[in-house]
Design a protein with these regions (language model features):
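Patatin-like phospholipase
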Residues: 1-21, 29-254
Length: 254
């Protein structure tokens, strides 16, 4: 995600709004706070697993997940300059899943940190988050690449970033591996039929980088940059096509 944003900045292509699910909501919220990919990169490269995950055995035995998610929420509060989504510099929405009813929930008002925590609450890993009267888990359960949400919020041209890894995994050794691999399969199936709605789809090569892998940040950043560079001709063409369509519509009205 960060590498893609960096290239958009370098190419002077403005980001009019950000809609994110799971880690996309985390990256998106930090960027929406100050529109600075270098600050975003610095934050990401300092980030370690212990900054986000408050694992407790008691949670796993008696709760609804291995981690409560309080560390993740505190991390967002410390890194995002604004408390509420309405205050962010870039219009922003996080996507979560209503665990009771299996419905997509768009969080575009209220606490930034709570919205990101809910959107990133991987089932079984993080406890569900009670927010705005709903019990919420990771948005990827129902919509891992929220193109429809961006369209509904008025996006004219949607650039979607798909960081899903290939589902093959022969190194499953424990219950956490089972949860993560099951989630990965679910996300992959979900993404497969949703991503076709994007004007431009960017697919960084992050195969082999797991959901909880914090050791390959530089590789992921470079993969995002390369994928965005590869997609740039398609993005430029899409921008010109939108401009031509608008010009034609205006001429027709005249």
């Amino acid at each position: 995600h960060i590498g893609v944003i960096r290239v958009l900045e370098q190419e002077r292509i403005p980001v009019a709004q950000v809609v994110g699910t799971s880690v996309g909501s985390l990256i998106g919220a930090i960027y929406a706070s100050d529109r600075d990919s270098f600050d975003l990169e610095w934050t990401a490269f300092q980030l370690e697993q212990d900054d986000l995950f408050d694992f407790r055995i008691a949670n796993a035995v008696m709760g609804m997940g291995y981690a409560k998610g309080e560390k993740l929420e505190a991390f967002v509060k410390a890194r995002v300059k604004h408390e509420n989504i309405e205050q962010l510099q870039v219009p922003f929405a996080a996507v979560a899943t209503d665990l009771n009813w299996g419905e997509r929930v768009v969080l575009d008002k209220g606490s930034v940190a709570k919205a990101v925590r809910a959107s990133s609450a991987i089932p079984g890993i993080f406890e569900p988050v009670l927010h705005q009267g709903k019990l919420l888990v990771d948005g990827g359960v129902v919509d891992n690449i929220p193109i429809e949400v961006a369209r509904a919020r008025g996006a004219d041209l949607v650039v979607a970033v798909d960081i899903g890894e290939k589902v093959g995994n022969t190194n499953i050794k424990g219950v956490v591996d089972v949860i993560l691999q099951s989630t990965n399969i679910m996300f992959a199936v979900n993404t497969g039929f949703r991503r076709q709605g994007a004007d431009v789809l960017v697919t960084p090569n992050v195969d082999g980088v797991g959901m909880l892998d914090f050791t390959q940040k530089k590789r992921c950043m470079q993969a995002g940059i390369q994928a965005a560079r590869d997609a740039m001709p398609r993005l430029r063409a899409a921008i010109e096509a939108k401009k031509a369509k608008k010009a034609k519509e205006l001429a027709g009205r005249g």
